[in-house]
Amino acid sequence: MNVSKPEQRTLHALAQGGHIAFLRDASGKITRVECYNRDGHLLLDCTLAVFSRLKNKGLVHSRQGRPYRISMAGLKAVRPQADNR
């Protein structure tokens, strides 16, 4: 599956335990997203456009109104990266 660099960065942060928080307008449409890594830092590469592409590809999912997390398809699509912790 073709995954762009911003999508890959977002998936990598989610695979390590991050989540995508979202804000909805009065009609229920998602208007803003914020991607946090496991340490609580904000990832700037995660825009609304990147989020919608990940959601349309089925790489992230949300259950019962909770923040979006990586799905099994997302775990399979993410490429390994070195973690310099």
Curated annotation (Swiss-Prot):
Signal sequence coordinates: none
InterPro entries documented for this protein: YjhX_toxin
Family the UniProt entry places it in: Belongs to the UPF0386 family.
Protein name: UPF0386 protein PA0712
